[in-house]
Every structure is written in structure tokens, then in C-alpha cells.
Regions:
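Helix-to-loop junctions at the C-terminal end of transmembrane segments
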Residues: 79-92, 175, 269-282, 366-367
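Structural signature of the two symmetry-related core transmembrane helices
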Residues: 95-108, 284-299, 376-379
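Helix-loop junctions at membrane interfaces in 12-TM secondary transporters
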Residues: 111-122, 302-311
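Intracellular juxtamembrane helix-capping segments at the cytosolic ends
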Residues: 132-146, 322-335
């Protein structure tokens, strides 16, 4: 390799996508185990989503009390994310199996709650454990991308989305057959425990470091755009069925197709990113995806029949599907081994504010102007993403 090529290889491009390169077999095996952790993590939360009504009933909580208890998920997760970033920088990937084991150990707690205060405490603990695992496995994938020079983040998030679907369906069917809430959550937690054991070996460190100063100037902006993407994700996931029922008069079965179509489109969109990201600029993909989401949500807000709204939610999901993988991957790859954990924690923590802000923001909008207005709020978030994407130094 001549000197020019060496310099070009060593020159750090901030927040840039990686190109395909055949990885070492051992590193590839490590990547497969890390990807399996995403599926296990998604399976747990899919099972949880299907079991929320049973958990609410066991705790004797009203809808309002359940909403308050669920708020403790975020209260616990955000500080835990920040702490995990520092731990990753200091201890490295050995933190990953510890966080997964912690999540597995506490995952069953919500099913054991028999009062609202107990449920709130359980959600606080589970939120903290989930936050640590979330940052750790995303940082692990980002580190593997740096080590292998391959795009992995879209596949990781696709597996998480696939796990959500699989866990929700499996838990729903098992619940219908008479299975208890605690055993079902314990089974989902056992998958996470198995992934913890599988991920007990850290990924190999990459040899070159990237300048921390250049990355820091972009992290907050990346996190804020991620928050808008998560606002859209959470909004469609949690409000699409309600929109179909209350605004369009759909029955419960038809209304359920809204979040289902959205979830499926997220999986397909993220899987497509495995081939698309190495071939196109990340900023262009993010911009075009946001514009697609914007158009789909505007059309959905004006829909008068579920046959229009359901595809609208699906197309919106496809448009936003690659936002989080692009932003998480860029933040992690743009950092050195010495500060990748903090970089991932910063973007993840800011990003998850979108999930927390979504329910009160969309709820207040729905109360003031109706659910069509809430969908337009999501469209506005997509417009901001489209405007901001070219300025994020993504390549």
C-alpha cells in the first residue's frame, strides 16, 4: 500500500458509514452472537407488550395509574444509560454480558407486582436494566462495525423489531392458552440470559482512534434528530390503532393492523439497509426516508378509510426505519474505543427523550385538536429530520 493510500485509510471521516470487507471468522462469530442479543432483547419487549393488560390487572391499576407506572421505565433508563457509557469506556465490552444478565435477572419483576407502587418500583428497576443493556449492545455492534468495516446496525435493529413481533405473537398465543404472566416473562428473560452467556467474549479492539473533539460537536445534534425519529416510532406504534378506531371507525381487529403493518415495514426497511447503506450516502438515505415518512403521515392524517391509513402507517414506518440505525451507527463508529461508550450513551439518552415526550405531547395535541392533529405532529417531526439530515456530517 503506498503512502497516499495509507493516509487515506488512516484519515478519520466523522460519522461516516463503513464499507464491506471480509471480516475475520472469529470476529464474524462475535458479531453473530451480538446480533442474537438484539433479537432476544426485542423478544422480551414484544412479550411484555402482549402481557401489559395482564400486568395491569394483577397490579389493580387503572389506565392512568398504569401510564404513571410505565413512566418509571424512562425515569430508570436515562441515568442508567449515562452510567453505562462511562462503564463501557473504562471496562470495555466485558460490560455487555453483565448488562444482559442484569436485564434477565429483573425481567420478571413486573409480573410479580400486586399493587401500583410495587409495579412502579418494578418498572424503575427494569427501566434501569434495560437502559444499560440497550447502550451496551448498541455500542458492541458499533465496535464490531469499526473492527470489521461492515454495516451491521440496520440488521441489529431489524432483529430487534423481528423479536418484538415474535415475542408479542408467542406471548399472546401462550396467554390465550392459559400460561401465566410470570412464567412467560421468565422465558423471555431466559433468552436474554442465554445471549449474555453467548456474548461473554468482547470484540477485538480496532487500532486507530478518532479525534474526540470533532465528534463531540455533532453528538447532541445527532441525539436530537434521533429523538425526533423515536417520537415518530413511538407515536405510530402507540397511537395508530387508536387513530383507526376513533377517527375512522375501525373495529379492534382492523385497528390492530395499523401497528402490525408498521412493525413489519420496520423490519423490511431495516433489512434493506444492509444493502443500501454501503452503497448510498447516509445523509441522503435519512433525508429521503424522512420525506417519505412526511408524505405518508400527511396522507394518513387526511384519510377517511382504514384502507388508506394502514398502508400510510406502513410506508411511514419504512421511511423512518433506518433513522436509528444510521444515527446510532454513525455515533459509535465516529468514536474511538476510549469514548465509544460515552458517545453511544449520549445519543441514546437524548434520543430516548423522544419516546418519553411522545405520549404527553401527542396526548395533549389529540385533546386539543384531535388525533389527526397528533399525526400531523409526527409529520412535522419528519420534516425537521429531512431538513437537519444534510447538516449532520453523515456520509
Amino acid at each position: 500500500m503506498d503512502e497516499t493510500a495509507q493516509n487515506r485509510h488512516a484519515s478519520p471521516a466523522p460519522l461516516s458509514p463503513v464499507r464491506s470487507q471480509t471480516p475475520d471468522v472469529a470476529v464474524r462469530a462475535t458479531a453473530h452472537r451480538a446480533l442474537a442479543a438484539f433479537f432476544a432483547f426485542g423478544t422480551f419487549w414484544g412479550a411484555w407488550a402482549a402481557l401489559v393488560p395482564a400486568v395491569r390487572e394483577a397490579a389493580g391499576a387503572s389506565n392512568g395509574e398504569l401510564g404513571l407506572a410505565l413512566l418509571f421505565l424512562g425515569v430508570g433508563s436515562l441515568p442508567a444509560m449515562i452510567a453505562t457509557g462511562a462503564a463501557l469506556d473504562r471496562l470495555g465490552a466485558r460490560v455487555v454480558p453483565i448488562t444482559l444478565l442484569l436485564m434477565a435477572a429483573v425481567g420478571v419483576l413486573p409480573a410479580l407486582a400486586h399493587s401500583v407502587p410495587h409495579l412502579a418500583i418494578a418498572m424503575l428497576v427494569v427501566g434501569a436494566a434495560s437502559g444499560t443493556a440497550d447502550v451496551a449492545i448498541n455500542a458492541e455492534i458499533a465496535g464490531l462495525e469499526a473492527a470489521t468495516q461492515r454495516t451491521l446496525m440496520p440488521l441489529a435493529h431489524a432483529l430487534f423489531s423481528g423479536g418484538l413481533i415474535a415475542g408479542s405473537i408467542a406471548a399472546g398465543l401462550a396467554r390465550q392458552a392459559g400460561a401465566g404472566t410470570a412464567p412467560l416473562l421468565a422465558c423471555a428473560a431466559a433468552l436474554i440470559a442465554a445471549s449474555a452467556y453467548a456474548n461473554r467474549h468482547p470484540y477485538p479492539r480496532v487500532s486507530h482512534a478518532r479525534p474526540r473533539r470533532r465528534i463531540r460537536r455533532t453528538l447532541v445534534a445527532v441525539g436530537l434528530v434521533c429523538a425526533l425519529a423515536f417520537l415518530i416510532e413511538g407515536g405510530i406504534e402507540n397511537w395508530s390503532a387508536l387513530f383507526l378506531q376513533r377517527e375512522l371507525g375501525a373495529n379492534a381487529a382492523v385497528a390492530a393492523l395499523g401497528p402490525a403493518a408498521y412493525a413489519l415495514s420496520m423490519v423490511v426497511g431495516r433489512l434493506s439497509g444492509q444493502r443500501l447503506l454501503p452503497r448510498q450516502r447516509s445523509s441522503r438515505i435519512l433525508t429521503v426516508g424522512a420525506l417519505v415518512t412526511l408524505a405518508a403521515l400527511v396522507a394518513t392524517s387526511a384519510a377517511h378509510h382504514p384502507a388508506v391509513a394502514i398502508p400510510g402507517f406502513a410506508i411511514a414506518g419504512a421511511g423512518v426505519a433506518l433513522a436509528a440505525p444510521i444515527l446510532f451507527g454513525a455515533a459509535g463508529r465516529g468514536a474511538s474505543d476510549a469514548d465509544r461508550g460515552t458517545s453511544m450513551a449520549t445519543v441514546t439518552t437524548i434520543g430516548y427523550l423522544g419516546f418519553l415526550a411522545g405520549p404527553p405531547l401527542l396526548g395533549a395535541t389529540a385533546a386539543a385538536v384531535g388525533l389527526r392533529g397528533s399525526v400531523l405532529v409526527l409529520a412535522a417531526a419528519a420534516a425537521v429530520i429531512a431538513a437537519a439530515a444534510p447538516r449532520l456530517q453523515l456520509r
